[in-house]
Regions:
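PLP-dependent amino-acid enzyme catalytic core
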Residues: 6-181
């Protein structure tokens, strides 16, 4: 519950800022990628040109991982891979999982995350608060071991009808998301 209250307060703060520009949004997903550019002055003062950075903390999940989660799920919807009742499956150490869980919840999909045993309990609990089912997998096994979070995600994807495995580490949409948004 505390997480929901926090997210709502943060979104209210973001909306206050964005409404000053006469912009409004239909839902929290429309805030993803609409992060401000900040000019870097001090760290680039000895370099020619102007340099900017995106302030990713203004994404609802406070991370650039929101961009990839939304972009990959939107593309899967366009391709007909996701429909009502579909399940999203992903491997994560936390940030991407949080974003995938948040976007899945808001789009109405079930979310299953295979998480390394190195992930903090706080991150795991936050993902659970967003409705994700969590499979904690040992971190001290090779990636091709059936118990690894990679292999658990692959197995679940094969076993669960109407599921989509995002596979962020090998998905070209991961990189594309940062150019598109």
């Amino acid at each position: 519950m505390w997480l929901l209250v926090f997210l709502l307060k943060f979104v209210a703060y973001q909306n206050d800022i964005m409404l000053k520009d006469n912009r409004s949004f239909n839902n929290i997903l429309e805030l993803i990628g609409n992060t401000p550019l900040i000019k870097l002055n001090k760290v680039t003062e000895n370099f020619p040109g102007s340099y900017f950075t995106k302030y990713e903390a203004f994404n609802p999940g406070h991370s650039n991982k929101d961009r990839i989660a939304l972009h990959i799920l939107n593309e899967a919807e366009k391709k007909g891979l996701l429909k009502n009742g579909s399940t999203i499956i992903e491997t994560t150490s936390g940030n991407t999982g949080f974003s995938v869980a948040m976007v899945s919840l808001l789009k109405g999909y079930k979310c299953i995350l295979a998480v390394s045993s190195k992930a903090s309990k706080d991150k795991i609990n936050m993902m659970k608060c967003l409705g994700a089912d969590i499979y904690v997998c040992p971190s001290n096994v090779p990636s091709d071991d059936p118990r690894s979070y990679y292999e658990v995600a692959k197995r679940l994807n094969n076993e669960i009808k109407d599921s989509v495995y995002i596979n962020q580490y090998f998905n070209e949409l991961n990189v594309e998301a940062h150019y598109q948004t």
